[in-house]
């Protein structure tokens, strides 16, 4: 049997040319020998992109012989030295279905068909191949195609890679274009109408004509003609098939076909040019996105926000819940409890039994046992209001709540407002707030980047896109996730089979206030301003926790005006308040002695100090100077333990406090940013030092010439700075006293310094002189206006008399101030 060579042409950049050398199964094809054409002849249609068909030759297209869905393999290792056909042969499965393309093509043509196959040109991307054959005399192309189609109907071929679809064959009417461009087949074809000759004109085919030519290749979905008002040339129409394989067959069989005049092609005929049309053009999408930034940018921002809420919020809530439960889990862990007990036993053996109160505050807690029990009872009640622990700095508010009242409480969250307020910038504030409750992951650094993106978007579309979030929005997210975690913790002990399973979550929390966590907000209103976003969001969130029965909220503050911001959050509620002050003389003595007794048991030289304290009898007088402030008493006790006498320890406290006052209120270079002046602060220090009982009437201070303008605002600012304290009677300010009891001794110590006192008094006199001179200038200006009138009405005489009296009064004050100034200057000269 003769071998008949089959030539497979791969229209790729590598221009591979595979030679099929197996004999066909058709006996008639083995009678002739097809001589292989020269390379130049083969390269001719590769370079031109067209297949030359002679008069005695025909061309058919066979589909479904290559896996078109695996066309991405052509860009991989298969594009090297080994051909696509060889790779297919390696995965040949002849026992399952049709295998390699050569075998499929042999089976396409029946054995009785009198044709010779000349060439096979595969189209890998389209999943088919062109087969060129030679006709015998008297045989027509239609007869050959009909015979092949009839043969495939009775002997269907299903390749291994697509066993659910059969191989189909169609006659090529046009002049197909053999190209290796990156064009993906699709169900939609763009049919362009070109003239059949150089001097002819193309005719736009009707929908009926297009249907008659393309329906034979498969089910049509739609035919869309070019709009009549369109000026795009050449004219075109879109032909959509229901399946991609129909469109592939139609393109390869009809491309380059010239429609004659009798079939609607015009006088010179109309040649059709076909190419694949992608349904979605990425360039169109890109252009639409770039041309509609007002829609796209906010949509992207909303999408990012939705993704963030969906993915990160549950994670953040989980971490917050884990931080709330972390302490309890550690305490309830049996292994950790055993290790802790063994360590305690070892410490007792080697170091003796130690007290559980390292600061020896037992005497203080015994005195405040009523406040502790009151707070614990409030936490067991169902009251939708805030609990406020108020007192000056150093009175032990935090220790009383956390170490005593909540010592055995399961779940508690502590938020330190001072850390948040002292952070510089919104990014730092967000990070501090998140770390307090365990909110993570937090991308606070992205807030600055998002601000730049928002700024660029504002320049493009005129409004902000919403990428960046304000401090208000970020804090709202943090507190909202914290509230969700707190509610989960409060409901963690609830079981489905208990007696109260029929109650809703809200009803259960309302019925069991003991199950709610406790939120402690420390340093509330620290460094607060009129419009503080941090405190507004905290109070708003705390109100939601309280009214929703999610948690108990306890505020710790030194600000006496705490009711104003809290009333905005809960306007119709009465707050439960505990005011902590300085301890009494007896409690202070017990506190100091407990320190000294503990030091004596430790073997320190505090035993000698105990004897000195008893001999000198100065402990009570020293405690009276300190006034019962816990922090000052603790400092004095430690100085005594280190070897100092009580009086020396008190002197050290006075000296340190004096230095702090001078630095903050008298010699502060940044005084312009404060709400008070050096002269106002020194005036209060001087008058309080010279007062008999260490207090001044509130109204008397306001009547001073130094406090004529914004006097109450200045006093409140000095109270916030803890230089003074304002006591109230029935809610009205009544008296001004030093901010700390020891400050009375500090003020006296400062005024005893003649040089410092004279210098600061001289500054006050200068300010008063300047104020009176300005007043006289105003009076004189008004008198000048009145004197310029041509006739002075009788009604102005009273006004003129009043102005003259004011000028005289101010002049008398100026004379007095100048006399005082001269005396102070003499003192300064004498001291130097």
Curated annotation (Swiss-Prot):
Mitochondrial intermembrane side: 316-832
Domain RRM: 187-279
CC annotations in GO: mitochondrial inner membrane
Mitochondrial matrix side: 41-294
Positions of transmembrane segments: 295-315
PROSITE patterns per UniProt: RRM
Subcellular location: Mitochondrion inner membrane
GO molecular function: RNA binding
Family, similarity comment: Belongs to the YME2 family.
Record's function text: Plays a role in maintaining the mitochondrial genome and in controlling the mtDNA escape. Involved in the regulation of mtDNA nucleotide structure and number. May have a dispensable role in early maturation of pre-rRNA.
UniProt-recorded name of the protein: Mitochondrial escape protein 2
Species, as recorded: Aspergillus niger (strain ATCC MYA-4892 / CBS 513.88 / FGSC A1513)
Phylogenetic lineage: Eukaryota, Fungi, Dikarya, Ascomycota, Pezizomycotina
Protein's gene: yme2
